[in-house]
Regions:
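Short, aromatic- and cysteine-enriched interfacial helices/patches
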Residues: 1-2, 112-115
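N-terminal trafficking/processing presequences and adjacent post-cleavage segments
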Residues: 1-22
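Ubiquitous "structural anchor" signal
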Residues: 6-7, 47, 105
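Charge-rich, solvent-exposed alpha-helical interaction surfaces
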Residues: 10-16, 26-30, 78, 91, ...
């Protein structure tokens, strides 16, 4: 699993990131009934070779971590893991759970990754 410093050097992987993907939307598109919208003009997931790459924040226990996830219709792989900066903890991890990136965290992460 990559660290933040290792991820910074992996331009191809950074370019795959879907910054607006959420954990809920990924499950909907790749695992559940939400992948049947043929008439909408949206891309429909057709096979396990289709995947999305996105970030989540895991707030179940300290230290809190940001994970880069690659999900297809069969599995979710953790590609990178690094600690959530403490300045974001209060706003992001008020409740236990796994969350999409909030805008401030997303802006910080984009700056860190040179996006």
């Amino acid at each position: 699993m990559l660290t933040l410093e290792e991820l910074k050097k992996n331009t191809d992987l950074i370019n795959e990131i879907e910054w607006n993907m959420t954990p809920e939307e990924a499950v909907k598109q790749y695992l559940e009934w939400g992948n049947t919208d043929w008439g909408s003009g949206k891309y429909v997931i057709r096979s396990k070779s289709d995947y999305t790459t996105y970030f989540v924040v895991n707030c179940w226990r300290k230290p809190y971590f940001i994970y880069l996830i690659r999900r297809n219709s069969q599995e979710a792989q953790e590609l990178a893991k690094f600690e959530l900066p403490s300045r974001f903890e209060k706003d992001v991890c008020e409740l236990k759970g796994v969350y999409a990136l909030e805008e401030e965290v997303k802006a910080w992460l984009k700056q860190e990754l040179g996006v």
